[in-house]
Amino acid sequence: NGNWSIDWDDFEARMTPDTHALLLCNPQNPTGNVWSKKDLMRIGKLCLEHDVLVLADEIHCDFVRPGVIYTPFASLPDKNIVDNSVTYKGLSKTFSLAAMKSSYYFCTDPTLAARIKRNHRSSQNSLGMIANEAAYRDGADWFDQLLPYLDSNHTLVENYLSEKLPSVGYTKAQ
């Protein structure tokens, strides 16, 4: 039907004592589905109940289509759910900076942050840091033009398939 949803019974059944983390893509890649606040809350509650850490990959968050509401996991109203998560973001998708190898993560729980810092080894690409700074500082106008352009590409593909290959279904990413 072109709509993506979670099979909640299967989801919870997979949370065994051997499950320690959930990698949550929001927006989901490759479907483009944007999880609702209600779904994110349910995911967060189930992960808390089963002592599963949420690793929220939100690197595609800038590509949400007009009219679609994207809810960052770290913005959920339950502090315990948010504290049980680490969010990953970056500009590699938004500004085509994948070669810069630069991204970042954050979490709100000081104990978890200290644990990550103690066990995580990282190094920064100095050119990547400069590229990210430039994108954040000067990229808004370019990006404001990109979203309508991408949206028109979705419409172009949808119209083409409808006309030339009507038996092929197409669902626009959210």
Describe the predicted segments one by one.
Residues 4-18, 30-53, 60-97:
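Active-site pre-lysine segment of PLP-dependent enzymes
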Residues 23-24, 54-56:
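Hydrophobic residues in well-ordered beta-strands that form the structural core
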Residues 84-163, 167-173:
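PLP-dependent aminotransferase class I/II
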Residues 10, 14, 18, 42, ...:
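Alpha-helical elements of Rossmann-like donor-binding domains used by nucleotide-donor carbohydrate transfer enzymes
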Residues 1:
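Substrate-binding/gating loop at the entrance of the active-site cleft, primarily
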Residues 27, 58-59, 173-174:
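Short, well-ordered beta-to-alpha junction loops that form the rim of enzyme active sites
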